[in-house]
Structure formats: structure tokens, C-alpha cells
Amino acid sequence: MTGKVISLGQVIVDLTMNVDAVPRAGEDVFAGNVQTQVGASFNTLYAVRRMGVKASHAGVIGTGPWASQILQTLENRGIQHIGKRDAVRDSGFCVALTDANAERTFISTRGAEAYGSVDAFDSVNPEKQDVVHVSGYTLVHRTADALLAFVKRTTEHREFTAVFDPSPMIATVDDDVFRTMLAYRPIWSCNECEATLIAQRLAALDNGNSCDCKVSQDIVQEIENANVNEETVAWLCDRLRSPVIVRVGADGAWLAIPGDEALRIPGFPMKAVDTNGAGDCHAGVLCALLCEGVPLEDAVRCANAASALAVTRSGPATCPDRKEVERLLGRVF
């Protein structure tokens, strides 16, 4: 039986635009291809729906024009909102700049999604076949208390799958929060930059042991030098005691599962038009296929294909449909 994907992340509105280069302080530039679209965790849930799997959003949505756009978009895409509403605040928004090299820069506001009370996720009770997607961005807002309450409530008897996207915010969460996520043992899904940040946090925990500290510092240096390889990913997996996925762009993704050797699952090189949302696409397809019982290695391979197609299109929510992914893979999944 196929489950559903439940997001505990945040849905906001993306104001996207293209620029030749991100402006310097005091500079005035004109942008092109300006669009207003619902984004953040919506991009992940959109990818889930493109795979034909049910999706629910449990985050807080506010009251106001941004919130209205979010609710309408969720309804249009068949995504159920199972979270709380904030009658006082509007939802947040983000300005996303994509430069001529397809790199992106973000400026975000905090809206209702960031101010959830500690009981915000108390009504979320995933079933065994469900996949819960957690975003590191939630851990740096007040809604973190609700997320940590959910994690603690479900740790001991958790039967569902949890996928954690640490985001760059993993560098700023306090040690107790970091340890809580370590103890939860989700599937960690990150890019190379985030892998570096995770390694740095793990190395800091090893400071009390000179042997472990030396090894961890060597690994951190390898990752910082953009040398994500079998050894570094295996080390991350061992220290996290959980499956680890490290996305490496057109080269695909590294996967390490406790007890198995780390392996690189090849990507599908494409000419990138816009990398905005590629990671969200990867995560959504991964979660959707795990709901269907697809083995983790195969799910990562499909996610690689989907995100490769996604970067050939402009916009934050550009996940291809299932048939397009199957054509690229040359098989049905």
C-alpha cells in the first residue's frame, strides 16, 4: 500500500527574477523574467504529486494575500493542508535571484510559518507507510519547538520513514537541537555545501577525543576541498548512524547506508537553465518513491533523473512528470 508524504517544512511565496549578476551594495540593476510563485516546501510537495503520490502540508499558514495564494496553489495541485492557521500574521515570502551562471541567491522574510506554537504538529500522526519530510529551516524559527516536540514524541516507536533536509541552517542550530536530530536517525539528504556543515558540526562533537578529532578534521578538510568521495560519505554515515545522500550536481549523488559500502549513483548531465528548486525536486521524488516501497538506491537514481530534467526549466517548481523521468531512465518504476 502506498503511503503519503507529509511535510513539516514551511511554504512561502517566491518572488523570482533573473539578473546578469547579483548587485553589489548600492548598485541598481534591472531584472527579467519576474514571477511570483509558491515555493519552499511546496516545491518538494509538488514533486511528490508529479510522481502521482499523495502529499500533505502540516506547516502553519497565515492570513493575508501571500497565505491566500499559498492555499489556492495547494488546492490546485491536490496537496492537503493539515496544519494550523495563523489569524494574525500573513505567510512569508522570499526574493530569489538567478544569475547568468544559473546560481541563486535568496532574501527571505519570516511569516506565520516561522511562528508556530509548540503544539503545531501535535495532530500529525503518520502511518507506517508514510514518509515525513523535515526541513532544517524549521529549526531556526519559533516553530522549531513544535518540530522538536514531534521528533521526541515519535522517536521511540517510529515506524514511518523520516527524510531530513538539513539546509544551510544546520550550521546555526544549537548543539542540543543537532543532537536531537542525530538521535532521530532520519535519512539525511543534502548537497556538498551542507555536507561540509554537517561534518563541521560532527567534528566539533569529537573535540573531546583527540583521535576522533584528528580523523574528523581530516574528513572536514576533504569535503571543504569539494572532494566528496566514498571515504567522506562513509564517515558521515558512520557518525550519523543513518543513511546519507549527498547530491553532487550533474555527477549524481553519493549514497551511504549503515552496513553497506558507499556508492556514487550517476547523474544525468544537462545544460542548466535554473538550479532553483533542484534540491527540492530531488527530495520530493525521493520521498514519493520511498512511499511506494522503492529501494533507497533506486529512489535516489530516479531523483537524480528528475532533478536533471528540472534544471533545464526556469522556476522553483519544475519537477518533470513521472513519464518524463521514466523515459530518461529507460524504464518504468
Where on the chain are the PLM-derived regions?
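Glycine-rich phosphate/adenosyl-contacting loop at the front of the ribokinase-like
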Residues: 1-60, 65-72, 76, 271-273
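Conserved phosphate-binding/catalytic region of the ribokinase-like
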Residues: 2-6, 200-333
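Structural detector of well-ordered beta-strand residues that form the stable sheet scaffold
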Residues: 6, 56, 162-163, 189, ...
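Active-site metal-binding loops of divalent metal-dependent hydrolases
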Residues: 11, 137, 281
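Conserved N-terminal subdomain of the carbohydrate kinase-like
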Residues: 26-28, 50-134, 158, 327-333
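Short, conserved phosphate/pyrophosphate- and ester-handling motifs at nucleotide-, phospho-/glycolipid
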Residues: 48, 191, 279
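Conserved beta-alpha-beta core of the PfkB/ribokinase-like small-molecule kinase fold
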Residues: 131-228, 234, 251-253
